[in-house]
Amino acid sequence: MREQPKNQISPDGLKVWRLQEIIISAVCLLIVIAVAVLSYYFHWPYWISGVLGAVWLLGSIVTVFIIPKVRHKVWRYEVHEHEIDIQSGIFVVTRVIVPMVRVQHVDTSQGPLLKKYNLATVKISTAATVHSIPALEMEEADRLRDSISRLARVTDDDV
């Protein structure tokens, strides 16, 4: 059995994931508040709002504080001369080996939150799908993109 990939994503990725989850939790809180207001106006049982509020609170705690930390711990990647090794997953751990001969192109992308922390996601496209390595420091993402592109081109020329 192979060893785990050695490289982890940036620690700032944890902050980005937490911010994303806070935004999602805030939207969900607005829905809970809307249900509470509707409960008041339409004389629905108040326990509905209470249960929704409790579910929101528990879900927010888990998705903001626990899942990002575990997710950061399990995300790993490593680039070899002939393949890219990506491992992710919390409950179901997925290990993907992408042969360099299958790589069609490599992109980096940044959303507003990633840009705030100078992070980027590297997307590796094959004929079948797109594999992503999230929340890498921008310099590392650029280096990785260029390295994969160079290795894929060399491998492609050899075939």
UniProtKB/Swiss-Prot annotation:
In the bilayer, the protein is annotated as: Multi-pass membrane protein
Q: Where in the cell is it found?
A: Cell membrane
Keyword Signal tagged? no
Q: Which UniProt keywords apply?
A: Cell membrane, Membrane, Transmembrane, Transmembrane helix
Pfam families in the record: bPH_2 (PF03703)
Q: Where are the transmembrane segments?
A: 22-42, 47-67
Q: What is its main location?
A: membrane
* GO CC terms: plasma membrane
Task: State the similarity comment.
Answer: Belongs to the UPF0699 family.
Annotated protein name in UniProt: UPF0699 transmembrane protein YdbS
Q: Which organism is it from?
A: Bacillus subtilis (strain 168)
